[in-house]
Amino acid sequence: MEKLYVEGNKILNGHVIISGSKNAALPILFMTILTEGKIKIGNIPNLTDINIALKLLVYLGVKITGNETLCIDASSINIFCPPYNLINKIRASIWILGPLLARFGKAKIFLPGGCKIGSRPIDLHLNGLTQLGATINLKNNCIDAYVKGRLQGKYILMEKISVGATITIMSAATLAKGSTIIDNAACEPEIVDIAKFLNTLGADIIGAGSNKICIKGVLKLTGGTHQVIPDRIETGTFLVAAAASQGHITCHKTEPKHLTNVLMKLTEAGAKIKTGKDWIKLDMRGKRPKSLNICTAPYPGFPTDMQAQFALLNSISKGIGTITETIFENRFIYTSELIRMGAKIKIKNNTIICCGIPKLISSNVFSSDLRASATLILAGCIAAGITIVNHTYHLVRGYESFPKKLNKIGANIKII
């Protein structure tokens, strides 16, 4: 998927079924390396990043069958250096390192790829593994890691909150000798889901979801069954789609408690919101949204992966709104494309200032990353005229059947 034709002036109404969380599914797939037992994992989204992860696992010797529910057997792993052409495609491939080290005592991987959003250093991953006793050499863009015997449990104080590094350390510590404490850990729902999965296999992890996670190392893990949590970012994206178009939507198979900050901001913008056990209903019919002031922050704060979508919302809202990005630098590239569509946006350091206008205009735009792709497609849906969104190959990395789902609620999107 390279280029999309998006018809504008659409009001988006209807029902959407939310897919499994990419940000939980990817690390969980790599965590299967930790055990010889047979595993079943359900609610796996059909995404290019997921498919690349599966190819990586198969290359290592993992046996995988199924589609949305996968049966995985990692008992026959016999390769410890995945190929560059796969590693380079997704940044999540760094999560292979901890499980290989913990179970086999060795791993060699090239520096990973993925979305180009500023600087995303892996120092915290490597420092954590070093503190657990691993020897790590970094040369020619390749990480060569090994440990004699088992990794050793340790108290680890994270220099800064990092979801990725928390996952790496937690997975490696699962099979370490002794206990590990991760202080200043990330608290995201995906961390909780990964810990739940590992505990299902026999790990001893408590505290996931707080800033202090305690892992008591075990000798080995067994098999088990797990259901991946819903994708909170996909949910938030569809809620913004309805809000920005002055429509109404019900998101099914989702988890409202994972979106507290997003729902608060949508309510502040004027949306009527109702929630149930696994659904969220938003109604913005006949109302132009009110502008919002937002600051991204680690969970339970406002998610960085939703700031582009809310920048779109601010662009067509009443008043002047601001969004301050505190997680990643260089994450405002998409704003130049919204400006091309008529948005009045100024950037000041790590803050964007949006002066809302009633209507965007169609244009030929280019997406720079995953969330920018979704945002520009939504912008095309509500703008006047026909918008062409280029470089949408990013989209299938993190949204399952996004154009198809939008078309079901009133959009008219075609692959060119």
Swiss-Prot record:
The modification 2-(S-cysteinyl)pyruvic acid O-phosphothioketal is found at residue 115. The keyword Magnesium does not apply. It comes from Buchnera aphidicola subsp. Acyrthosiphon pisum (strain Tuc7). Cell wall formation. Adds enolpyruvyl to UDP-N-acetylglucosamine. GO terms for biological process: cell division; cell wall organization; peptidoglycan biosynthetic process; regulation of cell shape; UDP-N-acetylgalactosamine biosynthetic process. Its EC number is 2.5.1.7. Pathway: Cell wall biogenesis; peptidoglycan biosynthesis. It catalyses: phosphoenolpyruvate + UDP-N-acetyl-alpha-D-glucosamine = UDP-N-acetyl-3-O-(1-carboxyvinyl)-alpha-D-glucosamine + phosphate. Belongs to the EPSP synthase family. MurA subfamily. Keywords: Cell cycle, Cell division, Cell shape, Cell wall biogenesis/degradation, Cytoplasm, Peptidoglycan synthesis, Pyruvate, Transferase. Phosphoenolpyruvate binds at residues 22-23. UDP-N-acetyl-alpha-D-glucosamine binds at residues 91, 120-124, 305, 327. InterPro entries: Enolpyruvate_Tfrase_dom, Enolpyruvate_Tfrase_sf, MurA_subfamily, RNA3'P_cycl/enolpyr_Trfase_a/b, UDP_GlcNAc_COvinyl_MurA. NCBIfam families: murA, PRK09369.1. The active site is at 115 (proton donor). The keyword rRNA-binding does not apply. It is found in: Cytoplasm. It comes from the Bacteria. One of its GO terms (molecular function) is UDP-N-acetylglucosamine 1-carboxyvinyltransferase activity. This is UDP-N-acetylglucosamine 1-carboxyvinyltransferase. It is an enzyme of class 2 (transferase).
